[in-house]
């Protein structure tokens, strides 16, 4: 929202600084050379963004007078946009460097690694993420530490342990039966999944993630094979929504995708083997598609040296090309496709590399940025908090020196990061 009258400055700034007793350092003004409107896709030149504490209080024409008391951040030579968001991360995991690390690290050690990964993600310009799958509620602990200001990192919506069937993608299947290995989220049957969701809610999760099909990085599961019955999926969705939690369904295979959409999930993760009917079903029900179209390149190039078994590399080969075709189909049909990368499969902090792939496989640069800002905010239900540079929203702001609408790869290395009014990076 823009304001072009001098009176507004007097009301918003001077009143805040004097009548309300606000300290001068609480007011920051960003001078933006170009400002991207994530809702309309328009770009406006020479804009002032006024910030009080952690919120944006005004967006004004650049010729308005700035009070002497305000701190000024000069980004007049930069392209300014909302902090971007990634809807599929594993910030407490790091398959990219060591496929078997999870078998040798304690949850405590993995959570400490998550602190490092969270900071890398924030410094890449990702001010909000969804973490979809973490045992022992490691992601809950990390989210809380970030929210309490103890460590730097993005805003996090977290799922805790992912639900899955016995022996499915969300179970642990690599060791023999004498180890009696079982993932935290394994639950079979409609009442068992309800109990698991209630437990997750008890320990503070923001959403539910479950595995509706097999996957790439699990042993012994076919990528497209459907897991969970419709009855079980409907129980997962009903129980989650009863508790005000949205539902993300890991689903590669088309039948599992359709079953999850019918059950009422909020997002389909991966969505590798889509057909037109599945896309239409999702569009009719308002389902989001969260499709990771960069990580295949990393896995095929570096997976073997990082210990990824040949079985899993072969499954990645099976999925990669087809998933990108599905991405193009969903974009062309007008589905809600959000930015989601599966970080942890590739190195944390490289999330921005997916923007160029999104454009290569069908999005315009504007669509690619919106998929990581206004559209992701809609999926989270946080439209009144993040996803745009507007009055009342968190001051989550990034900037680059080039124009990402001309060269989307500019977003692979951002120059400025602010989250909640605090500057974390400024080149």
Language-model segments: residues:
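Divalent metal-dependent hydrolysis catalytic cores, especially in the metallo-beta-lactamase
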Residues: 114-139, 153-162, 205-218, 246, ...
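Alpha-helix-loop-beta-strand connector modules within alpha/beta enzyme cores
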Residues: 144, 148-162, 224-249, 286, ...
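Metal-associated gating/positioning segment near the N- to mid-region
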Residues: 79-150, 165-169, 173-176, 231, ...
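Bacterial N-terminal signal peptides
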Residues: 6-19
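Histidine/acidic-residue-rich catalytic or RNA/ligand-binding cores of hydrolases
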Residues: 95-99, 218-220, 257-263, 293-308, ...
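Histidine-rich, glycine-flanked metal-binding segment
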Residues: 35, 40-81
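His/Asp/Glu-enriched, well-ordered alpha-helical/loop segment
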Residues: 242-246, 310-311, 317-404
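Active-site gating loops and adjacent loop-to-helix segments of metal-dependent hydrolytic enzymes
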Residues: 93-110, 166-181, 216-230, 285-320
């Amino acid at each position: 929202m823009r304001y072009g009258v001098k009176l507004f400055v007097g009301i918003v700034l001077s009143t805040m600084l004097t009548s309300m007793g606000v300290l001068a350092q609480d007011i920051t003004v960003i001078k933006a050379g170009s400002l991207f409107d994530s809702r309309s896709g328009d770009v406006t030149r020479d804009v002032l963004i006024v910030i009080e504490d952690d919120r944006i209080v005004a967006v004004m024409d650049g010729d308005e007078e700035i009070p002497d008391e305000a701190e000024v951040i000069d980004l007049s030579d930069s392209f300014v946009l909302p902090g971007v968001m990634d809807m599929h991360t594993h910030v407490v995991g790091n398959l990219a460097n060591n496929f078997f690390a999870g078998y040798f690290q304690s949850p405590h050690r993995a959570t400490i690694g998550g602190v490092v990964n969270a900071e890398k993600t924030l410094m890449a310009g990702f001010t909000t993420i969804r973490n979809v799958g973490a045992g022992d509620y490691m992601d809950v602990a990390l989210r809380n530490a970030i929210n309490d200001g103890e460590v730097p990192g993005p805003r996090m919506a977290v799922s805790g342990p992912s639900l899955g069937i016995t022996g499915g993608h969300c179970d642990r299947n690599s060791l023999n039966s004498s180890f009696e290995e079982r993932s935290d989220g394994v639950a079979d049957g409609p009442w068992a999944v309800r109990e698991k969701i209630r437990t997750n809610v008890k320990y503070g999760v923001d959403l539910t993630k479950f595995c509706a099909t097999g996957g790439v990085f699990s042993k012994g599961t076919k990528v497209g094979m459907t897991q969970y019955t419709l009855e079980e999926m409907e129980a997962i969705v009903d129980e989650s929504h009863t508790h005000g939690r949205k539902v993300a369904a890991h689903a590669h295979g088309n039948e599992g995708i359709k079953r999850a959409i019918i059950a009422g999930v909020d997002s389909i993760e991966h969505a590798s083997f889509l057909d037109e009917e599945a896309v239409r079903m999702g569009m009719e029900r308002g389902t989001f598609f969260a499709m990771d179209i960069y990580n295949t390149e990393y896995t095929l190039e570096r997976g073997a040296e990082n210990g990824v078994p040949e079985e899993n590399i072969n499954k990645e080969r099976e999925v990669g090309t087809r998933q990108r075709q599905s991405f193009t189909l969903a974009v062309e049909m007008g589905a809600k496709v959000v930015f989601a990368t599966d970080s942890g499969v590739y190195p944390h902090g490289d999330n921005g590399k997916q923007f160029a792939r999104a454009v290569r496989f069908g999005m315009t640069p504007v669509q690619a940025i919106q998929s990581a800002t206004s559209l992701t905010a809609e999926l989270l239900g946080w439209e009144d908090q993040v996803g745009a540079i507007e009055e009342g929203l968190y001051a989550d702001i990034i900037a680059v020196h080039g124009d990402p609408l001309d060269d989307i790869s500019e977003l692979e290395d951002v120059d400025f990061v602010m989250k909640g009014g605090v500057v974390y990076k400024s080149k």
